[in-house]
Structures are given as C-alpha cells and as structure tokens.
UniProtKB/Swiss-Prot annotation:
GO terms for molecular function: arginine-tRNA ligase activity; ATP binding. The lineage of its organism: Bacteria, Pseudomonadati, Pseudomonadota, Gammaproteobacteria, Pasteurellales. It comes from the Bacteria. This is Arginine--tRNA ligase. Its EC number is 6.1.1.19. Keywords: Aminoacyl-tRNA synthetase, ATP-binding, Cytoplasm, Ligase, Nucleotide-binding, Protein biosynthesis. It catalyses: tRNA(Arg) + L-arginine + ATP = L-arginyl-tRNA(Arg) + AMP + diphosphate. The gene is argS. It comes from Actinobacillus succinogenes (strain ATCC 55618 / DSM 22257 / CCUG 43843 / 130Z).
C-alpha cells in the first residue's frame, strides 16, 4: 500500500479535470502536524499560478472533481491553497489487516525493471579495508530493497582484477617458486605485493620479466592466466569471509571484474576514433568534452587510450555501460562509489551517450557517498596512521559488543550471547553508516553506535525483541489472531498510518539509493510503537481490544524485522 501514490494519482486526475495543465503535479506529502491532516497536497498553488487563477478557488474546483469516498473522512482547503487530507479510520483498519496477512506486505511494483547495481569492488591481491565498507553495505541495502519491490537485480562486483601489477605479482610468485599460491592467506599475498613492488622498483631484470608477463597475460598466455586466476581466487575467497560476516548478499558469481570488458576495448577505441569523438594528441587518443572545462576554460580532454596503447578506467567504464545495456538488458544501472569519482563517471557516461552506445531511456546513475572519518574529522586510520583492515574493524566491533551485552544481560546462555553479540556488533557498524545521508562525510564513532539510546542498531534490535516478548508472555502466536483491528485511541491511529507508510519508505530507497530513508522510517516506527505501548494496555485489555492491539504489535514487529533485514541487519528473539 502506497498511500502517497494513491492520493497523488487521484488528485492529479482531479486537477486535470479542473483545468490544470499536464503533467499536473499534486505534490502530495505526509503532513508534519495532525491539525493539517494525514497528507497534504501542496501542488495546487503552482498549478493555479500557471492558469492565472486564485489558488483557493482552484483548490475548490479540484475538490469538486476529487472522489476519495471510503479513503478520506475529511478534506479541507488550508492557507493559500493547500488541501489537507484526513484518512478514514475504516479504510486504515482494512489495509492494516491486509498488510499483516499478505505476502510481502502486499507490496508489488507496477513495472519491475532489470537493474544492475555495481558495488563493493575491491582490488585483487589486496585485503579489504574500511574504504570498501560504505560501497558494500549501502549498495547491498539498496539491492535488497529493489529485489523486495519486485525488480530483477543483477549484482556487479566490479573488482580490480587487471593491470600491470599482475605482471610483477606473477613474476614474484615464480621467483619464490610458490606453486601452492592458492593455499596462501591474503595477508601473505599483501606481503608478496609489497615485496614484488620492491623488486620491480629496484631490479631492472625483474621489472623486464614483469613487463613481459603483462604482455603475455594480455595476449592470453595459458601459464600467466593460471597464475592470474590463482591470485583472483585467493582474494575473492578472503573477501567472501568479509561479505558473509557483514551479512552481505554478494557471492563469487557476482564478480564482474575489469577483465570482463578487456575484449571490448580495442573495438570501442577504434569506433570512437572513427566517429571523430577520439582524436590523437601527443600519441594518446583523447575525447574532448565541451561540457567540462579545464582551468583555462577550454574543453577538457579525457584519455581513452594511452601513448603506449594501454587503456584507462574511463575506457573500461564505457565498455561496462555498453555491456550492461546490451548483454545484461538492464533498464537502469547504479554505481556506488565515493564522491571523488563523480566527474570521472559523468565523463565516461557522457562519452557513452555521445557515441550512441546506449539509448536515452537507459538510466546511468552514480549514487555517490562521502568519506568515512575518524572523530578528529580526518580520514579514518589506525593509531599509527595506517589503513584499517575491514576484518580488524569487525573484530573490534565484536569485542566491544561482547562487553556491552555482558553488562546488559549476564543471564544469557553462551549460545544466546554469541548470537546477540554478532548481531549487535555487525548491525551497529552497518546501521551507524546506513542511517546517515550517504552524500555526506560520515564520522565513525564506537560510542555513538554501540548504545541502546537513540537511532542505533541496538535500539532498533531491542525494539523488535521487546515486541516479541509481549507474545511470549501472552503465550500467543501472531498468526492465531482472528479479531479485526479496531482503533479506539489516537496513538493506535498514528501507529497504523506509520505502518502503512512502509512502502513509501522503500520507494524512497529504491528511487534515490538512500538507505537512511528506511532507517529514519524504522526509528520513527519504533518510537510510535513505544508511545502506543505506554498509552494503550495490551495484555490487560479486554477482548476484542486486546487482540486488536496484539495485531498492531504483530504488524509492527513484522515491519521492523523486514526493514532491518532489507538493511542487512539481523534481529534476535532475546537480548
């Protein structure tokens, strides 16, 4: 049930019937204050202005053409021309009952799309660090939400699995006569990487061999491909451990690395040159874009092939866009990477469109995110200034959560405690990030995330557990409740409206790639349930009020659990 969408469609038709120009935009929003109704239509004044009419008079014309029988119990014109909508109690009750019993809350997408979501994207032969956290968890929350809404989602883990570094790694593995590379731990591989780089910088013979291996690898040499595949497999096995711990849905089948697009690059560059988009400049092939200016005010040049014949990230991203459109048949692509990549993505996609590689209807979106900062406002680092490994961060989260839970509930069994600690530790790291607007820099603070106060994972997880405990005390299963929902208190009405707004929150996440919209919704829902619980006795009430309130509690628990699951955060039955 998407109340906002339903009201928007009906008011739009009424506006057009009243004489508004198409496309009429009713601008229906949730009301901030109860005296202004449950929803407001704010687009009447803009439509009236275009027609040269008095807004209040036009609002009355809209009401004359608006049929909300059975949906709204009252409509009123307010201020300079707002329309306030007060929803019918019977209508709310009917849809709350449907939402509780329906599969997927009765949520369906009218026009499901095929959507490619590019996220996480770590580099091969390097361990995942905190810099990969935001892309991984934000992307995964959006993926889960898009799938829940009925879309076909293709996960694309665009790993850095190609480049000159593989020549030196293969050469160094050979030098060490380490044919058992696939059994190595990634930490060893990182040490290999540093040692290989040192040899490459200081040993010309080694560097020459490494360069030869790059050429051989790129030309498909079998030995080099085998060694390269070992490096990729070791890395992805280790990354999978992080994904599993983070409760992220990526698997090895989602890997679509840079190497996937290599065969397309020569043809793309040749075509860009043939179309006159790419021109030679000092031996390199460059596309000049009028839409971007350099510091001198001239069109900015974007290199698509280097002087030595090598390709760049831009070339690969052009190929990726083309591949996702024509091979994966996507309607929409979302690439989750940090804000510093914005210009790069805009330029790559502008070239893609200028070359005619994708239709205008093909949506290319870059939902970027800000940096992860320490409490000092600087990029998040170890105490010695090094990069924080993702594994180490998660280990510390578990240690801290263990202390928090031990203090809060020492009576948990060892098995119960382990489950709660893992859920709280990983949930806290994820929720603390996901609850912030992704476009801003985010300050990582253990004290603010591992607490049962405020908009945190522990608070949300406890809110769910608290509701479940009501049913445990009552000895009742939620699906055994057959009485109708009845609303006898304003707190019940407010709670039902919030529950029915679940789909609106999910659509916000899907439309803009912003999980914080769902976090805010869940936090408000938990607060409204708490207010309802304080004001409206449940277990001490007489039937049918008792069962009605139990149904509201069941729907609140179901919604909280589903919402947290879409964020990739686990719930527990006991804390």
């Amino acid at each position: 049930m998407n109340i906002q969408q339903l009201l928007s469609e009906k008011i739009r038709h009424a506006m057009i019937a009243a004489g508004a120009q198409q496309p009429a935009e009713p601008a229906v929003r949730q009301s901030g204050k109860p005296q202004f109704g449950d929803y407001q239509a704010n687009g009447i004044m803009g439509a009236a202005k275009k027609l040269g009419l008095n807004p209040r008079e036009f609002a009355q014309k809209v009401l004359d053409n608006l049929n909300l029988d059975g949906i709204a119990e009252k409509l009123e014109i307010a201020g300079p021309g707002f329309i306030n909508i007060f929803l019918s109690k019977n209508w709310l009750v009917c849809h709350a009952d449907e939402m509780l019993s329906a599969v997927n809350f009765g949520i369906k997408t009218a026009k499901p799309q095929t959507i490619v979501v590019d996220y996480s994207s770590p580099n091969v032969a390097k361990e995942m660090h905190v810099g990969h956290l935001r892309s991984t968890i934000i992307g995964d929350a959006v993926v889960r939400t898009l799938e829940f809404l009925g879309n076909h989602v293709i996960r694309a883990n665009h790993v850095g699995d190609w480049g000159t570094q593989f020549g030196m790694l293969i050469a160094y593995l050979e030098k060490m006569e380490n044919e058992n590379a696939s059994a190595m731990q990634l930490s060893d591989l990182e040490a290999f990487y540093r040692a290989a780089k040192e040899h490459y910088d200081n040993d010309e013979a080694f560097a020459e061999k490494a360069r030869n291996y790059v050429v051989k690898l790129q030309s498909g040499d079998e030995y080099c491909r085998i060694m390269w595949k070992k490096l990729v497999d070791i890395t992805m096995r280790h990354n999978q451990e992080n994904y599993d711990r983070l409760n992220v849905t990526l698997t090895e089948k989602d890997v679509m690395g840079e190497s996937l697009y290599n065969p397309m690059l020569p043809e793309i560059v040749a075509d860009l040159k043939k179309q006159g988009l790419a021109v030679e400049d000092d031996g390199a092939l460059v596309v000049y874009l009028d839409e971007f200016k350099n510091k001198d005010g001239d069109p900015m040049g974007v290199i698509v092939q280097k002087k030595d014949g090598g390709y760049l990230y831009t070339t690969t991203d052009i190929a990726a866009a083309k591949y996702r459109c024509h091979k994966l048949h996507a309607d929409r692509v979302l690439v989750f990477s940090d804000s510093r990549q914005s210009q790069h993505m805009q330029q790559a996609w502008l070239i893609t469109r200028k070359a005619g590689y994708v239709p205008d209807s093909f949506s290319l979106e870059h939902p970027f995110f800000g940096m992860m900062l320490g409490k000092d406002g600087k990029p998040f680092k170890t105490r010695t200034g090094g990069t924080v490994k993702l594994k180490d961060l998660l280990d510390e989260a578990v240690e801290r959560a263990d202390k928090l839970i031990a203090e809060r509930n020492p009576d948990l069994t060892a098995e119960e405690k382990a489950a709660v600690v893992e859920a709280v530790a990983i949930g806290s790291v994820k929720y603390s990030d996901l609850s912030k607007n992704r476009t801003t820099d985010y300050v990582f603070d253990w004290d603010n995330m591992l607490t049962f106060e405020g908009n945190t994972a522990p608070y949300m997880q406890y809110a769910y557990t608290r509701i479940r405990s009501i049913f445990a005390r009552a000895g009742i299963e939620p699906n055994s409740l057959n009485d109708d929902i009845v609303l006898t208190d304003d707190k019940e009405r407010v709670l039902v409206i919030k529950l029915l707004q679940f789909e609106e929150a999910l659509n916000g996440v899907a439309k803009d790639g912003m999980p914080h919209i769902l976090c805010q919704y869940l936090y408000e829902l938990a607060g409204m349930f708490s207010a309802f619980y304080e004001a409206c006795p449940i277990l001490n009430a007489e039937r049918p009020i008792k069962n009605s309130r139990l149904k509201l509690a069941a729907l609140a628990a179901k919604t909280l659990k589903q919402g947290l699951d879409l964020l990739g955060i686990k719930t527990v039955e006991k804390m």
